[in-house]
Amino acid sequence: MSNDTSSRPCAPAPDALPPGDMDLVESVRVPGDGGKLTLLRRGEEFSLRVHGTELMNSRVHESEDALSELAAAKLAGISSPVVLIGGLGMGFTLAAALKRFDAGAKVVVAELVSQVVAWNRGPLGPLAGHPLNDPRVVVREMDVARILQSEEDAYHAILLDVDNGPEGLVHGSNDWLYTEDGLWAAFTALHPGGVLAVWSAGPDRAFLMRLRKTGFEAEEVRIRVQAPDCGSRDTLWIARRPA
C-alpha cells in the first residue's frame, strides 16, 4: 500500500466500461432522494450503478479489503471488538473484517437499501463468500447516520463505505456523514482509542482537515486498484479517537 499518487497509463478502469453489454438483474429506488440503484451482470462479473455511474465492480475490491485490514491493524490486541460497517455494497468490506477480527467479535452492518441486503443473500453472496451467514454479523436495515446519532462509546471500529465518499452520488443525506457534525457523531460513537476508517473514490484534503479538527489522529492512504503496476487509486482515511 502506497501513499504515492502517481499512476501509469493502462487499460481503462472497470468504471469506464459501458454497461450496454451487461444484463440487468434489478433496479431499485433508493429511499428518499437517492435515485435509482441498478445491479448489472456479465458472466461472473457484477456492477452496481447509480445515475449511469459505477459505484462498484466485483472485479475490483482491493480498497474495500484494505479498509477493513487497516482498521483491524490499528486494533491489534483487542479481543471481541464491536465493529460498525456503514454500507454493505457487495460484501467485500464485511468479508475482510470477518477474516481479521476474532471469533468473539460483533459486526453490525447498517444498509439503507433493503434490496442490497437481499442481493447479498442472493446473486452477490458467492462473491465474498456469503459473509452475511456468519453468526457474528448483525444487519440493521437503516441509515448509518441514525446509529451514529444515537450511540456513544459503543464501537471499537467504524468503517464507512458509504456512497462515493465525501463527494456522494447516491443519497444526498449521505453528505452529513462527512461534515463536522457527522464526524463528531462518529467520534462520540467510538470507544476511546477506537478507529474510524472511511473509503472514498478520490482524495479530499478538506476532509482530512475536518477529521483532525474533530479531534481524530488521521492519515490519508491511497490504494492502487487493478493491475499492480497501473490503474486508478482509491482513498482511505484511517483515524483514531485518542485514548
Tell where the protein language model's regions lie, with residue ranges.
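Short, basic/glycine-rich phosphate-binding loops at helix/coil junctions
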Residues: 44-51, 161-166
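N-terminal auxiliary segments of SAM/dcSAM-dependent transferases
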Residues: 1-49
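C-terminal lobe and adjacent flexible extensions of AdoMet/dcAdoMet transferase-like proteins
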Residues: 237-243
